């Protein structure tokens, strides 16, 4: 039809024009009109009549009924109503929405094809949705929730004086009853480990800074958290399978660093195992951790773990957050989580911050120890269990005598590629520090062994070495953790390596013992034991899982002093005590592991 007729009247800004097409109605059906020579006349400032000399009308009949036009009008009305919000919608929000929708579509498709194969992805997705909804719910109704629980909170505070002793007694009775029934089935090794745990608590109390002012809630709740985690992870099938699966996934993930090492160093990079195999894992993991920090995952995870310890143990937000952070990052990085607040924390909090760093290992070196052949699941479990242990020991060894004043806020900005690059660059110093320390300590150890052998030869004892001396010193401590008496001498030597040098040398030595056991062969060669039982290996893995050594002592003093110069004197005064507390925290974790381990008497 070539006609000239008024198509529409109204405000020109509201003219329903879309890509040279006009939607209109004729009788009960939709007409889609393509126009040319469009003209208009302004009758007043509000109304405009549009004319078209050449109008090509396409009649679609019953295929497009009237309700489609209503839907179109509803969409236009919605856009007009929310035009401000739509105009200022951020593109990143749109990208996130599209990405989440695509991800959910992939999850649904994968579960439809093979649910068993997609079960890990499904579980991770459900957990992510749960925590996102939980955060939204808490953020929106936080005041109402606090008001709802405030009467119960006030009642607990009034009754806490006697209630805390009832809970502590109940916890002790439950552990003792469980030990009695469990020992009748599995032997007396668990009792030795539990006795070692009690021994370390008593020793910390005897040498406490203020033994009469100990707050027992963090102590008993920290040990209770250790037992709960140990039982869930080591004695329940679901917990053991979950952490075993996590350990395997971490080990598989870290093996991707081999691609970069192979490209840079060539196909025979494993000929220099430590330099070209182990250290690239540190670089790769540091990069990944930096990226996770950028996207906010690490802050969220550390915050949740820290909140659990803060609520359950009654520790302050600063020390709880740092203890949680030490599960994933190193002892010099975790204080950066609370950097603005370090000048204002109490001496006990400062001691707890340093103890948490000494009692755990960094995620970046976790992969290096795994590459030695040490169990990834046990290393992961040890890192988690030592976090509450560090706070328990710290509050026992240096009780709080001041009033904490600090609350927390957070923030970090960086783009993803910058975060990845920054993580890789940061790892340069870490890798260099590891390499030079291993070189210098091994050289020093060789010199000490040679000198001690010369001295021992004067008294017809040429086999005198630094390891032997450490073995005799730490042998009682290793035995009280639950290590077999025949293996306690070897584990004592490993503890000496870890304390006076670093845990790298100790885990390297432990890996050789594990390899000797896996190869089989004679247990004794020339009167020297070549490997240990599996139980002793696992307990040693837990006992060595920490940065408590003299090399780290200087690192912590220098790092914290640069962050909080006003606390220089307090840092220097409490650092050595914190190292001892971190060592004992690792020993207590090993005792708990020895108490709940499934292994029977060899």
State each model region's role.
Residues 219-239, 259-293, 423-450, 483-490, ...:
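Core transmembrane alpha-helical segments of multi-pass membrane transporters/permeases
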Residues 2-27, 31-101, 130-170, 249, ...:
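Intrinsically disordered, low-complexity non-transmembrane regions of multi-pass membrane transporters
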Residues 244-255, 300-314, 323-326, 340, ...:
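Short amphipathic alpha-helical coupling elements at transmembrane boundaries
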Residues 90-98, 104-126, 160-163, 175-195, ...:
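Membrane-lumen (extracellular) interface motif
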Residues 56-73, 128, 132-144, 179-182, ...:
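Juxtamembrane and boundary regions of transmembrane helices in multi-pass small-molecule transporters
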Residues 143-145, 190, 215, 220-223, ...:
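Interfacial/capping segments of alpha-helical transmembrane domains
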Residues 425-526:
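Transmembrane helical segments that form the transport core of multi-pass membrane transport proteins
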Residues 310-366, 370, 416, 491-592:
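Alpha-helical membrane segments and immediately flanking helix-loop junctions
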């Amino acid at each position: 039809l070539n006609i000239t007729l008024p198509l529409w009247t109204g405000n020109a800004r509201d003219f329903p024009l879309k890509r040279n097409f006009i939607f209109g109605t004729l009788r009960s059906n939709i007409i889609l009109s393509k126009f040319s020579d469009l003209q208009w006349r302004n009758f007043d400032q509000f109304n405009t009549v549009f004319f078209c000399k050449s109008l090509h009308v396409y009649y679609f009949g019953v295929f497009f009924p009237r309700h489609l036009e209503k839907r179109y009008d509803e969409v236009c009305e919605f856009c007009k109503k929310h035009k401000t919000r739509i105009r200022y919608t951020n593109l990143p929000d749109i990208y996130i929405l599209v990405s989440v929708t695509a991800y959910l579509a992939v999850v649904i498709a994968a579960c439809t094809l093979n649910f068993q194969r997609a079960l890990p992805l499904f579980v991770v997705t459900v957990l992510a949705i749960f925590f996102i909804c939980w955060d939204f719910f808490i953020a929106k109704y936080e005041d109402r929730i606090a008001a709802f629980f405030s009467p119960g909170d006030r009642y607990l505070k009034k009754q806490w004086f006697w209630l805390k002793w009832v809970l502590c007694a109940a916890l002790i009775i439950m552990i003792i009853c469980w030990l009695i029934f469990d020992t009748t089935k599995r032997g007396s090794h668990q009792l030795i480990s539990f006795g070692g745990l009690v021994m370390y608590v008593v020793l910390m109390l005897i040498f406490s800074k203020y033994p009469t002012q100990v707050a027992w809630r963090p102590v008993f709740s920290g040990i209770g958290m250790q037992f709960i985690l140990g039982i869930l992870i080591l004695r329940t099938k679901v917990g053991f399978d979950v952490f075993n699966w996590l350990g395997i996934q971490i080990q598989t993930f870290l093996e991707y660093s081999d691609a970069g090492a192979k490209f840079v160093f060539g196909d025979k990079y494993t000929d220099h195992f430590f330099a070209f195999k182990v250290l690239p894992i540190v670089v790769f993991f540091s990069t990944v951790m930096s990226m996770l920090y950028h996207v906010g995952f690490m802050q969220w995870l550390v915050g949740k773990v820290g909140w659990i310890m803060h609520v359950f143990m009654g520790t302050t937000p600063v020390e709880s957050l740092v203890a949680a952070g030490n599960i994933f990052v190193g002892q010099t990085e975790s204080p950066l989580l609370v950097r603005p607040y370090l000048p204002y924390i109490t001496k006990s909090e400062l001691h707890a911050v340093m103890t948490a760093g000494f009692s755990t290992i960094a995620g970046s070196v976790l992969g290096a120890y795994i590459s030695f052949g040490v169990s990834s699941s046990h290393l992961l479990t040890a890192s988690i269990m030592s976090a509450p242990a560090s706070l328990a020991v710290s509050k026992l060894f240096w009780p709080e005598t001041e009033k904490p004043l600090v609350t927390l806020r957070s923030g970090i900005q960086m783009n993803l590629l910058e975060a990845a690059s920054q993580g890789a660059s940061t790892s340069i110093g870490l890798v260099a520090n590891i390499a030079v320390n291993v070189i210098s300590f091994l050289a020093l150890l060789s010199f000490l062994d040679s000198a001690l052998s010369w001295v021992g030869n004067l008294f017809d004892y040429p086999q005198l070495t630094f390891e032997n001396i450490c073995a005799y010193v730490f042998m009682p401590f290793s035995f009280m953790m639950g290590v077999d008496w025949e293996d306690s001498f070897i584990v004592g030597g490993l503890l000496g390596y870890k304390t006076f040098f670093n845990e790298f040398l100790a885990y390297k030595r432990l890996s050789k013992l594990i390899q000797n056991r896996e190869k089989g062969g004679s247990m004794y060669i020339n009167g020297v034991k070549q490997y240990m039982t599996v139980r002793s290996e696992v307990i040693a893995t837990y006992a060595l899982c920490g940065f408590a050594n003299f090399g780290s002592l200087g690192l912590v003093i220098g790092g914290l002093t640069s962050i909080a110069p006003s606390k220089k004197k307090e840092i220097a005064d409490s650092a050595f005590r914190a190292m001892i507390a971190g060592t004992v925290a690792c020993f207590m974790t090993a005792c708990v592991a020895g108490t709940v381990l499934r292994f029977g008497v060899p």
